[in-house]
């Protein structure tokens, strides 16, 4: 007799869907930095050199991978990932909004710092690893998670060119500010999704720092 394949729990799907919000806004914002920084002031950009703009984009990439080490310490020892994840999304959302009002390189660097800090606290992956209780489901679950990550990344990268050049461009001014605001809005919506939807299904998962939870077990 064939054993019926068990599906993923609802907590997995709600948490995994959060990845779409985060990656969509990240790739929308990241793709825009280089173009925004090098575009002329007359077209709504900052008029910076290609070198400075490339450094900005590289800094966002680097810090968004380095600062999560700090975030890992936080969720391991001090605050549960269930709380840091929506807070991190809100902080990143504020960062993208800073990009929408930036008129100097300093404003962009402020955006980079806040976005990187927010992503450092975004610890959705470890939570997903804990809502999956069946060992044989772990690999398929993370494969599905990365599929949703790629969906968000693709949509963000695809939309950015259409939005800033066609949808929001007006009278020769490109739509950089509205695009950054959309990235911010997506993160705020993602935080709301996490708080009002994911929390209903997570139960005690991620409420306590992971190290304390492991010690109790």
Spans of model-derived segments:
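Intracellular loop-helix junctions on the cytosolic face of multi-pass helical membrane proteins
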Residues: 1-14, 135-139, 161-217
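Hydrophobic core of transmembrane alpha-helices in multi-pass small-molecule transporters
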Residues: 20, 95, 106-123
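A gly/Pro-rich, aromatic-decorated transmembrane alpha-helix motif that marks the paired
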Residues: 31, 70, 151-167
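Short amphipathic helix-loop junctions that connect adjacent transmembrane helices
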Residues: 31-54, 165
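Central cavity-lining transmembrane alpha-helices of secondary-active solute carriers
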Residues: 55-76, 154-156
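Cytoplasmic membrane-interface "Motif A"-like loop-to-helix N-cap segments
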Residues: 77-89
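C-terminal ends and interior cores of transmembrane alpha-helices
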Residues: 87-109
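Intracellular juxtamembrane helix-capping segments at the cytosolic ends
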Residues: 121-135
